[in-house]
Structures are given as C-alpha cells and as structure tokens.
Amino acid sequence: MNTVRVTFLLVFVLAVSLGQADKDENRMEMQEKTEQGKGYLDFAENLLPQKLEELEAKLLEEDSEESRNSRQKRCIGEGVPCDENDPRCCSGLVCLKPTLHGIWYKSYYCYKK
C-alpha cells in the first residue's frame, strides 16, 4: 500500500514539475506566435486594400461592358404598377392613373390603350 502511495506521489510531483515547464514553454511559444502574427497582420493589412481595389476595378469593368452590351429592359404587363416618370409598359400598354378599383393605391398602372 505504501508503494502505491509513493508511486502516486512520485507521478504527481513529476506531472506538476513538467506541467510548469510546459506552461513556461507554452507562454514563450505564444509570444513568438504573436510576434509572427503581427508581421502577418501587417502583410494582411497591406494585401487587403490591394485586393479590394482589384475587385472594384473588375466590377467597374464588368459594369461598363454590361452597359455597352445591355439589351432593353423587360417591359411591365397589364395591371402592374408602373412609374409615371419612367414607364416601362409593354407595347400596346400605357401607364395611367387607376380607375375605380385602384384609386386608393395612389400609383400608376399599365393599361391597354
């Protein structure tokens, strides 16, 4: 029984002493990683604006190409709300103020001519 206690005590002392050493090593490793991380963060801070500028340039380029090759916008069908200043009603339809059923909507709708 005493040998079990002595063995347990010996293992406990070794675990505590090695645990302290590991704790110090871990602390030093964390300091090294944070120092390396600062360099990485500086690199990332410089890289991020460059990437954003590249993406923005690509998007603007796509928009300009799209506007050159764009087709006419789709038209609005009958009985659908439209904008009186920019009517996009299909051919044969006109953007008019509603009569009877839609008076309370305060909007314009596409109607047949």
UniProtKB/Swiss-Prot annotation:
Transmembrane parts of this sequence: none
Q: What is this protein called?
A: U11-theraphotoxin-Hhn1a
Pfam families (alphabetical): Toxin_22
Gene Ontology cellular-component terms for this entry are: extracellular region
Q: In which tissues is it expressed?
A: Expressed by the venom gland.
Coarsely, its chief localization is secreted
Q: Give each disulfide bond as a residue pair.
A: 75-90, 82-95, 89-110
The record comments on the domains as follows: The presence of a 'disulfide through disulfide knot' structurally defines this protein as a knottin.
Location relative to the cell: Secreted
* Record's signal peptide: 1-21
- Entry keyword set: Disulfide bond, Ion channel impairing toxin, Knottin, Secreted, Signal, Toxin
Superkingdom to which the source organism belongs: Eukaryota
Q: Which residues form the propeptide?
A: 22-74
Residue ranges for the region (Disordered) are 59-83
User: Compositionally biased, Basic and acidic residues: which spans?
Assistant: 59-69
| InterPro entries the record matches | Toxin_22 (IPR012627)
Query: What does the similarity note say?
Result: Belongs to the neurotoxin 14 (magi-1) family. 01 (HNTX-16) subfamily.
Q: Which GO molecular function terms does the record list? A: sodium channel inhibitor activity; toxin activity
Question: What's this chain's function?
Answer: Probable ion channel inhibitor.
